[in-house]
Amino acid sequence: NHIMVGFEELEVARIVQESLFPKPDFEMNRFRLFGRSVSMGELGGDYLDFFKVDETGFVVLMGDVAGHGVGAALIMAMAKAGILSSGEQLASPKIILNGLHQMVLASKSSRQKKVMTFQYLYMNSVTGAGLYANAGACSPLVYRRSTGIVEELKLTGGALGAFKKAVFNEMPVLLASGDAVIFYTDGIVESRDRSGREIGYEGLQQMLVESYDADPAVYYQNIFARYAKHIGGQEAQDDLTFIIMTCL
């Protein structure tokens, strides 16, 4: 029965996906994090994670697999397994992205061509210094509390698995007390109100300024409230995934 097989596959994918996501709250030295993914359907293609590497370092990562279902969930599982087994390389975002790229390429078949956008940040939780790399994902935004300005961590790079040959770069990041970094997928930017007007990148930046709170969970709730007001009771048009990181 094709219908029963379909339901069983969805259940497997859901279980796999739920096992990949971290607890929503994370704290380490000067940093507080909160992450949440809201799917428009039973299964989303978004992936987020953050975890401690050693006594001072931690990583933040976010991905978006093209498509949904079992295939997307398995790609996420492979990515997490690959990252967790990377040891000392966890401090080098571009090495991690290159390894994931090779993994996605190797997992492709003629029937199923998977592509995954991905971003990776390694942070020193004491100094506030880090390294960031991006593979086709939305550029994170940094809210500088001292100036009230929102900056973009802009770094180009193709999606994982999109091309056989790929070069991934990394850039330094330095955060001060009161700063916040917001990772997001394009679901928030492309959300439309009842007249069809998108929030857009400028709208999102304004939303981040107006929503700021040193507690990342409260910051997220403030952003989500403004998003809900914008769509005006309509159903979500896409998955909505955020990681918010604040520096004490």
Regions found by a protein language model. Name each.
Residues 2-181, 229-248:
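… and, occasionally, acidic/histidine-rich disordered N-termini of signaling adaptors
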Residues 142-145, 192-198:
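Cytochrome P450 core scaffold surrounding the K-helix E-X-X-R motif
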Residues 188-190:
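Short acidic/polar inter-strand loop motif in beta-rich domains
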